[in-house]
Amino acid sequence: MKNFIRAGAVVILMTGCQKIAEQQHPSSSSDSPTEVSATAVNRVNAVSTTVTTEATLKAAVANAKAGDIITISGTIKLTSTLQLLNSGTSSSKINISGGTLDCSGQPSGSWGVKVNGSWWNVQNIHITKAPDAGIVFQTGGNNYVNNITTDHCGDTGLQVYNGASNVSVNNCHSSENYDAANAGENADGFACKLSSGPGNKFSSCAANHNSDDGWDLYGNPNPVTITGCTSTNNGYGAAGDGNGFKLGSSGQNMHHTITNSSASNNIGWGFTRNGNAKGAVSYSNLTGSGNGKGLIDL
């Protein structure tokens, strides 16, 4: 992401303007996850909408175009999966932020939020009590995720898979996720596994007390980068593996990268290749203590 402005500095002019984003601070070329792209709102007649109900939220999402800003106010109870299917552009992203999505009223097996579109900024949202995964990036790419909290979901809190690529996940927290139907075998804090595309990254995220692993990269056919993340107290229920960071699977030679991260008090390994080729994972400055099987198996 380039040319950022802080979310609080965005001013939306609804018609007849050449530029609809005023910048309070100088632009930066850094990939800062805590700021909204200045170019995300440079479409003339971009719409800024604040929503308070499921109906208005889903209408705003269904009609979203490049540059639009959707703000969730308060708590919205969802009765079905929220689907982000439209796409922004590299210079004019779609933005959704704020509030809590209570997914407890959804049918069994439902994801809380599904993202199949591309070029979204998704930030500052609490997603809770989804019957299955909290938020899934299923397809699409170039989505930017910041300060998302997922908890008490019936599977993984935040998952990237099925070809989804260049998803940048920053400053997110995932905890207390548990799949009761499988005695905790599958509910990770974060997962980027099975079939995700290239270029996916996690930075400054935390996973705590999930029934399976903190991070799960099982079977991923593309390298993943993890930087500055923390994984603690994972693994409970009869079937949870409880690794802090599971970095591959048997038969793979996948060159994931993990740096400056910590794993403590997980019932399995702190950091494990999980059958990935020995030496395939690039790592540095990994710390932690109190893991049931040890700190590093890479």
What are these regions (language model features)?
Residues 55, 75-78, 130, 141, ...:
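Short beta->alpha connector loops
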